[in-house]
Amino acid sequence: MTATCSALRAASLVALAVVGEAAVKVPAPLKAVDPLRASVVSVRITGQEWNWRTPWAKQAPWNRVVTGLVVPGPRILVASAAFGNHLLIEVQKLGRDERWPARVRLADSEGPLALLEVDDPSFWAGLAPLPLAETVPVSGEVKVYRWLSSGQFDAATANVRQVRAARHGLSRVTFTSLDMTSAMEAGDSEVVVGEGKALGLVTSRAGDNLIAMAAPVLRQFLAAAAEPTYRGFARAGLAWQEMVNPALREYLGLLPGEGGVRLTRVLPHGSGAGVLEAGDVLLRVGDAPIDATGHYEHPLYGRLSCAPLFTEGRRPGDSLELGILRNRERLTVHVTLRRMLPEQERVPPYVIGQGPDYVVRGGLVFQELTGPYLTAASEGGRRPAPRLLIAVDREGAVPDPARPRLVVLASVLPDVANLGFQDLRDLIVTKVNGAVIGSLQDLRGAFASPV
């Protein structure tokens, strides 16, 4: 009996050893990760804005969580204007608490789009890109995805109302976009998915209405980012009026049923500069006829604004053929597409990655007029000075080599020496000591050369 038990015990030990050896050599298969969960990540951004009313100070730091889409590289694609004044970027995956540091490889505020990189290879384990759709639907149900701070993978149904042209964030560029309705409180780059492909990234919400940058635009951004030199998005730089007034149409020489819009402004740093003129009637962009309200018929999406025709599928430096009506004569002209940066404008609409420049002299605080300055001037229920709004409307977008910027007396510091002047603010400075002022550099020079 004892010999039998010993034999059984020895056999059991041998069996356990074999099983243990097999367990080491052949690990249990990993649980498959849902492709959607594997392609959507959370991006945590910590940033700090400058105080444009007291330009030597900063505001309190802020934190924001947005959604990122894994794309080939591997990299993370985000549609958000939160990059530029950021201090720290961290990413999370698969609903876990662990955070990895990330950095911006490329950010274009005219998207607004950004590509992030994560150097730690362990972050990419279990993640995979989700294909970007080549086209987007004009109707039907889609899904919107994101990770919640609780670690839950959140999904909501959205109904596509239409595909239309829209601007996103701070951008002045008009893109093809998805217009949807959904109960999700989105607007932070949530991923829109249909038939297993990414259809877009949500950038804004109004009520139950969501606007997403469409996948073809995202594909164009990634293609541009892969080039040795990033060229960005082209923009027309045109303003126009609709041609629905019969008397005006007849005066300009438009035929019955003929479309076209009348150009009211051609910016000197835009794509139409040197070729188009205010008063021209834009009849055609490429092969697309323009109707009397500035729309054209897209082969897939129907009636869209003609503005994206200068941007999508084309890059800065490309030549674009236009049909115009000038002095009752129909002409074919070619323009070279240009990227229009905010710093090229006399009043930059936004400032990214740097604080305000300023000059303090005798307790007087001077700044250059910018979009953030106007925003700060409207805080606390106040309204910006009408003179500033008029200046921005008339001159803000038009570069002037002689006066590249508008300098303003922003405020007066409280001091006994400044009694009686303490209420002066938001005044445009044109001359100091007889010198024309077109920048803070001019102002410094004028103060250094008293009359």
For the regions a language model picked out, list residue spans one by one.
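Conserved active-site neighborhood of the chymotrypsin/trypsin-like protease fold
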Residues: 72-154, 177, 181-182, 186, ...
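Flexible, gly/ser-rich surface segments that form the specificity/activation loops bordering the active-site cleft
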Residues: 106, 125-175, 202-212, 222-232, ...
